[in-house]
Amino acid sequence: MELWGRMLWALLSGPGRRGSTRGWAFSSWQPQPPLAGLSSAIELVSHWTGVFEKRGIPEARESSEYIVAHVLGAKTFQSLRPALWTQPLTSQQLQCIRELSSRRLQRMPVQYILGEWDFQGLSLRMVPPVFIPRPETEELVEWVLEEVAQRSHAVGSPGSPLILEVGCGSGAISLSLLSQLPQSRVIAVDKREAAISLTHENAQRLRLQDRIWIIHLDMTSERSWTHLPWGPMDLIVSNPPYVFHQDMEQLAPEIRSYEDPAALDGGEEGMDIITHILALAPRLLKDSGSIFLEVDPRHPELVSSWLQSRPDLYLNLVAVRRDFCGRPRFLHIRRSGP
């Protein structure tokens, strides 16, 4: 998981922004010549690292290592048996590495190239344009698990929360929670059909489909929420679109050209979906239920001010947590009224 974290933050330009202003163009790519004399995994990693570096591809060595390892049937280059490092590859393997590397030269994210990625120890299928789960979102999951553990200890019984995830994408958050909370149930919603399909696929892949209800739903449509199969909820969890609209053009090529912009663009102040979630929460949550959100570092103050202007919601911002880069990234909001 380290690759995407380093790649993402290396591409950031300015505090709290996911992206880069580096220019690029598909038309500049040309097919690579035959790899004469290159036959081993180590040689191929070295070759493609050099090619990527010359073309300004972020995380050049890590990208080449992941691609070569994938073709050889491993998740990481370091996990390959040392004997495979110097063993000659077949012509089919060489061709596959060339084809995958050409996609990286077009700035396709490694996660889409490989077609899978690990999140919280789960191997998830990745398909463009469904949003790729970031490493900091694993910290959001860990915070939710801590809260469930604390509540379970307080009541003296195992945690069996009913959880709603808004904007499930690949299902990373929902499936991680289900895998670590065996008594839990999850409702996962998303307005994008591609995300719903991928969450279904990942749930079946992990054999968690019996405890998750996946719904194609636009959360901005209030009438849709009257048809939820379970409720009320103990927890609402979301990594919503939170990029400020004016920052969308500054996103890195890997993000801007491959991921669904609707999963990123949060409107003028990045708050459009966040405020929809908060406005609906009192109708969906149990008494003392909680909301956990991943947000832009500029959002904690904006959310706090917005909640103060809506006392009728009976929602309080009780905690803000920083991500691994020290930025205020996660919010815990609790219902505290009727």
Curated annotation (Swiss-Prot):
Assigned keywords, A-Z: Methyltransferase, Mitochondrion, S-adenosyl-L-methionine, Transferase
Record keyword Manganese present: no
GO annotations of cellular component type: mitochondrion
EC number: 2.1.1.297
GO biological process: methylation; translational termination
Positions in coiled-coil regions: none
InterPro entries per UniProt: DNA_methylase_N6_adenine_CS, HemK-like, N4/N6-MTase_EcoPI_Mod-like, N5-glutamine_MTase, PrmC_N, RF_methyltr_PrmC, SAM-dependent_MTases_sf, Small_mtfrase_dom
Top-rank taxon, per record: Eukaryota
EC supergroup of this enzyme: transferase
Binding-site positions, S-adenosyl-L-methionine: 167-171, 190, 225, 239
Name under which the protein is recorded: MTRF1L release factor glutamine methyltransferase
PANTHER family reported for this sequence: HEMK METHYLTRANSFERASE (PTHR18895), MTRF1L RELEASE FACTOR GLUTAMINE METHYLTRANSFERASE (PTHR18895:SF74)
Residues reported to bind substrate: 239-242
Gene name of the record: HEMK1
Primary role: N5-glutamine methyltransferase responsible for the methylation of the glutamine residue in the universally conserved GGQ motif of the mitochondrial translation release factors MTRF1, MTRF1L, MRPL58/ICT1 and MTRFR.
PROSITE patterns in alphabetical order: N6_MTASE
Compartments in which it is found: Mitochondrion
Reactions this protein catalyses: L-glutaminyl-[peptide chain release factor] + S-adenosyl-L-methionine = N(5)-methyl-L-glutaminyl-[peptide chain release factor] + S-adenosyl-L-homocysteine + H(+)
